[in-house]
A protein has these predicted regions:
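Extracytoplasmic metal-acquisition and chelation regions
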Residues: 2-20, 25-389
Length: 389
């Protein structure tokens, strides 16, 4: 920082001169403070989870701006002019990768961003993630097969497959979806291609650890002066995530295997379910995206799976409307958990208890297990401390 000495000049000046010198000194201090703020690494992160990770790693050495708000979803996000302005001024952009953020390329071009892009997904084993995705699709294949069977029945029962109303509309609120193609896959809905890997990598704490490590490494390369700080904070936060993972595993292991079956809002919790050995009976929206539309046949097949696998509750996600979940729960005669929504695509707003990644994961663990009729123990001190973000 620059220090300006005004001692000799002040001695030569009268009261007016001294006042002027004092003003110059204060102006200099103000400029120095602004310079210090300007010296911070300017970071823009796409999702709320990545914004939290970047904040945890960056600490006082960064100025982090998140593009998505609490409750926002990367599946249908459109940057505002303010978002583009922040991006254009940033030194670093942190993205998820795995084809989650379709808006990034156009946003980078429109904003004129010319900094460093850190792809958090590069910190994990994507080959393993692809395999876990495939295993999840195999597990849910019973739902897809049932949907095809239902669709086949519809073809026989209705001469015009585009006009059928799927029975009594009063008893089937989802009739409006009946003209959807039952065999529609999760990866080609609306022309979006997510590849072979479910992009919701952060839902497993051990994958979050790899993403945080990638962010810490990226910050260190972009800002070598503070590299040691980024490394230290990253290691400390990863240690907390390790404790979080261990705690969650212990909670789910205490639940009988037959009860560990879940229906989610959309296919967003694949890695969470895999790591904690939770069965997947299907999703309300059978897609990686949360703005897809299920067919009537897919809904009927999901209801059949709920009955067949003894699902106790259907969960609503914070970024989704509970309307369809309530319809399915009513048809399946099970509970819909909409008062304690799960946080998958987005973290919660301030005061929700899920405004941090750690807090959201603890919340999801507790909400799921309690809906199954179980209970959880208090998380470790380090995890509890990190829940406030």
């Amino acid at each position: 920082m620059r220090h300006h000495s005004l001692t000799k000049r002040a001695q030569m000046l009268g009261a007016t001169g001294i006042a002027l010198a004092a003003t110059l000194l204060l102006t200099s201090c103000g400029t120095n403070a602004a310079d210090a703020e300007h010296d911070k690494l300017k970071v823009v992160a796409t999702t709320t989870q990545l914004t939290d990770f970047a904040t945890q790693v960056g600490g006082d050495d960064t100025e982090v701006t998140g593009l998505l708000p609490a409750g926002g979803s990367a599946h249908h996000f459109d940057p505002t002019p303010a978002d583009l302005l922040a991006l254009g001024q940033a030194d670093v952009l942190v993205v998820n990768g795995a084809n989650l953020e379709s808006f990034v390329d156009s946003a980078v071009e429109a904003s004129g961003f010319s900094g460093v892009i850190i792809t958090a997904a590069d910190g994990i084993d994507l080959a393993e993630a692809k395999q876990i995705t495939a295993e999840g699709e195999d597990e849910a294949s019973g739902t897809a097969a049932a949907a095809d069977a239902v669709a086949h029945d519809h073809d026989h029962d209705h001469a015009d497959e585009h006009d059928h109303d799927h029975g009594d509309e009063a008893n089937h609120d989802h009739a409006e979806h009946a003209d959807e193609v039952a065999s529609e896959t999760a990866n080609d809905h609306d022309g979006h291609d997510h590849g072979d890997t479910n992009p919701h990598l952060w839902t497993a704490p051990r994958y979050a650890e790899g993403m945080v490590s990638e962010i810490a490494d990226g910050f260190a390369q972009a800002d070598p002066e503070h590299a040691a700080n980024y490394t230290k904070r990253g290691e400390e936060y990863i240690a907390t995530l390790t404790e979080l993972d261990r705690w969650a595993a212990e909670q789910f292991a205490a639940v009988p295997e037959a009860d560990r079956v879940l229906v989610s809002g959309h296919d967003s919790l694949r890695y969470f379910l895999h790591d904690y050995e939770i069965g997947f009976a299907g999703a309300i929206l059978p897609s990686f995206e949360d703005n897809a539309e299920p067919s009537a046949a897919q809904i009927d097949a999901l209801v059949e799976q709920i009955h067949a696998r003894g699902v106790k509750a259907i969960f609503v996600e914070s970024s989704m409307s509970p309307k369809l979940a309530k319809t399915i729960a009513r048809e399946a005669n099970v509970t819909v958990v909409d008062d304690t929504a799960l946080y998958a695509d987005s973290l919660g707003s301030a005061g929700s208890g899920a405004e941090s990644y750690v807090g959201a994961t603890v919340h999801n663990t507790r909400a799921i297990i309690e809906a199954w009729g179980g209970s959880v123990t208090d998380p470790p001190a380090a995890v509890d401390a990190a829940m406030e973000g």
